């Protein structure tokens, strides 16, 4: 079972490496969106610090959503998705592997570059660690939730818009508690409550989302 999971993750990561432009698009989108706000809001440090948590999280959310179309569409187009559904292991395990690969390709680079981007918002140095931890908890959850929407729209023309409508309402709790953790840390308050809720949501998503995504894939491919 673990060997199958490893094969799926390595396969998707290798395919993504061959399509470097797609991977870079997500990262550049995050950097550009987050960098436009300081240019438009002016150099006021207090305003930048106050707006930074929400801006960084919205940019990460939109960048994550931008890459959801690559989760299943390529495999559906070349017929390999149907072959993956025939493996003896549960389809939920296949979903977990693909979500892990998606996060390694799209989510982890955002997590690593976010503290650097946060410097232009004059965030306190102590808040950068909280930002990193919040994104480490929140971005996998974005991938898990997004996988459900991506599975429901496999093979649908214009599915990207439909995915956005499906997953954006479900992203709201992640946005609230992720930005809240960074804001609490920046203002000298305790961010552990927000981080604990993010961790609980991630655990819940890890348990439920793969099965929901597997069911959505079966419905879409029937």
Residue ranges and their predicted role:
Residues 129, 134-168, 218-222:
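A structural motif at transmembrane helix-loop-helix junctions in multipass membrane proteins
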Residues 96-121, 141, 145, 178-179:
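Hydrophobic alpha-helical transmembrane segments that constitute the membrane-spanning cores
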């Amino acid at each position: 079972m673990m060997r199958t999971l490893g094969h799926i993750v390595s396969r998707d990561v290798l395919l993504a490496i061959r399509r470097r432009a797609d991977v870079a698009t997500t990262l550049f989108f995050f950097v550009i969106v987050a960098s436009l706000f300081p240019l438009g809001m002016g150099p006021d440090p207090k305003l930048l610090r106050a707006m930074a948590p929400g801006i960084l999280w919205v940019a990460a959310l939109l960048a994550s959503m931008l890459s959801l179309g690559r989760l299943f569409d390529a495999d559906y187009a070349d017929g390999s998705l149907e072959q993956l559904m025939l493996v003896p292991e549960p389809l939920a395990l296949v979903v977990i592997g693909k979500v892990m690969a998606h996060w390694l390709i799209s989510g982890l680079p955002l997590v690593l570059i976010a503290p650097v981007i946060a410097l232009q918002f004059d965030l306190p140095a102590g808040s950068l660690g909280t930002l990193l931890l919040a994104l480490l908890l929140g971005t996998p959850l974005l991938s898990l939730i997004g996988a459900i929407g991506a599975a429901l729209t496999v093979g649908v023309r214009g599915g990207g818009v439909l995915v956005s409508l499906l997953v954006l309402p479900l992203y709201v709790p992640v946005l609230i508690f992720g930005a809240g953790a960074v804001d609490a840390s920046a203002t000298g308050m305790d961010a552990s409550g927000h981080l604990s809720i993010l961790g609980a949501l991630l655990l819940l998503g890890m348990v439920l989302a793969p099965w929901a995504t597997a069911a959505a894939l079966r419905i879409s491919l029937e």
